[in-house]
Amino acid sequence: MRALLSVSDKEGIVEFGKELENLGFEILSTGGTFKLLKENGIKVIEVSDFTKSPELFEGRVKTLHPKIHGGILHKRSDENHIKQAKENEILGIDLVCVNLYPFKKTTIMSDDFDEIIENIDIGGPAMIRSAAKNYKDVMVLCDPLDYEKVIETLKKGQNDENFRLNLMIKAYEHTANYDAYIANYMNERFNGGFGASKFIVGQKVFDTKYGENPHQKGALYEFDAFFSANFKALKGEASFNNLTDINAALNLASSFDKAPAIAIVKHGNPCGFAIKENLVQSYIHALKCDSVSAYGGVVAINGTLDEALANKINEIYVEVIIAANVDEKALAVFEGKKRIKIFTQESPFLIRSFDKYDFKHIDGGFVYQNSDEVGEDELKNAKLMSQREASKEELKDLEIAMKIAAFTKSNNVVYVKNGAMVAIGMGMTSRIDAAKAAIAKAKEMGLDLQGCVLASEAFFPFRDSIDEASKVGVKAIVEPGGSIRDDEVVKAADEYGMALYFTGVRHFLH
């Protein structure tokens, strides 16, 4: 038996090589892997000695040789292949262990294009693909996490075709991921990220019980190990719908730096939000906005879930809590609640991934765009359109309202008072209907909107929403502007003594 080991990530390769040697494998290797194995007392043959061909062009050509690829690719059960192998002095290679030049890491560490180009692996993917193609005869490894499993399988004599088939699938996933990143990087560097092709590659984290509905399959995939590093289940398992709501709640609650923010989300839209002096008070005021919709919702906590906050949340049924951190006493509060699910990022404050791009599936393809973000100075740079200026406290509330609006399905309007959302209308086909729905819900909840501020993610097409806002005592408004009737909206704000700001930035969300 013969194995070829050539890896960039050398974690565990010495131990793996020793185990293979003990199992009777002859070992071939290249470059740094060869040196490391030899230094650790493993009998190893350098590929250039095996092929009788030196490495060429500063190592660009090492394993691209018939004795390597012929040794991997020839079928052991095909008499003609066996004959050709003997005639050409090609010896079988039964195990290929390769991982690739660190192209992605290089692009993160350096902007030197020559260095980046040199870290595009050629021979590695070729060997992986060859071994994967001939999986019926050859084992292929590209992940150090598989070393132990492979050794155990070999020792037990369970190296069957089905085992190798699973390694083959993983190998093609690995090379596809590698090539996709290279293509995306080149398009990002030279075509602004919008080239002729776009590759979206994620790594599976776990299967969900089902998809959005019970008859659909579902799973969570991640970019750059984000969930593996920042998502830990303390109680229960996340469903497909939980994950989309967690995403919405986390994005909103984490948008205010280290502020003690609480966001409550249901079906992707906020039904409660507040920033008060502490997390308990933030939760109390967030819940007031719409305690009915909060039932069975997702609560995101930008800080630590402690016992006091846990007891307060436990007064009603929420399905999911996502907190930056959770202490043991808080977890004990929910011990008797079977249905609640609790997740943490094990961090002082909530962490967002800040993905650079966003995409949505449409039948026949997908649409792709830069991710939307509310700029740090968006409100600061907004243009005052009215005669009246907002007070310092009103400006704080306007910033909160503006960010909530950006994370809420269009059309929406958001009313905020003293750091807490007091009314919201969202997902409406008419902005005036959103305004009326928000006010009606606030009245139902017994909330006083007098002195609140108002934000809209897109312009007001008519003055009717301003007229409606005046009836409940709105004092300041922020919106993008851009309507052909902006003058009417400004005039209405002045009539009612409101402060009105145009940001010039729309935040549609569909």
From Swiss-Prot:
One of its GO terms (molecular function) is IMP cyclohydrolase activity. PROSITE patterns: MGS. InterPro entries: AICAR_Tfase_dup_dom_sf, Cytidine_deaminase-like, MGS-like_dom, MGS-like_dom_sf, PurH-like. Gene3D superfamilies: 3.40.140.20, Methylglyoxal synthase-like domain (3.40.50.1380). It catalyses: (6R)-10-formyltetrahydrofolate + 5-amino-1-(5-phospho-beta-D-ribosyl)imidazole-4-carboxamide = 5-formamido-1-(5-phospho-D-ribosyl)imidazole-4-carboxamide + (6S)-5,6,7,8-tetrahydrofolate; IMP + H2O = 5-formamido-1-(5-phospho-D-ribosyl)imidazole-4-carboxamide. Pathway: Purine metabolism; IMP biosynthesis via de novo pathway; 5-formamido-1-(5-phospho-D-ribosyl)imidazole-4-carboxamide from 5-amino-1-(5-phospho-D-ribosyl)imidazole-4-carboxamide (10-formyl THF route): step 1/1; Purine metabolism; IMP biosynthesis via de novo pathway; IMP from 5-formamido-1-(5-phospho-D-ribosyl)imidazole-4-carboxamide: step 1/1. The keyword Zinc-finger does not apply. Residues 1-142 form the MGS-like domain. Pfam families: AICARFT_IMPCHas, MGS. Its EC number is 2.1.2.3, 3.5.4.10. It comes from the Bacteria. Keywords: Hydrolase, Multifunctional enzyme, Purine biosynthesis, Transferase. One of its GO terms (biological process) is 'de novo' IMP biosynthetic process. The keyword Transferase applies. Transmembrane segments: none annotated. GO terms for cellular component: cytosol. The IMP cyclohydrolase activity resides in the N-terminal region. Belongs to the PurH family. This is Bifunctional purine biosynthesis protein PurH. It comes from Campylobacter jejuni subsp. jejuni serotype O:2 (strain ATCC 700819 / NCTC 11168). The lineage of its organism: Bacteria, Pseudomonadati, Campylobacterota, Epsilonproteobacteria, Campylobacterales.
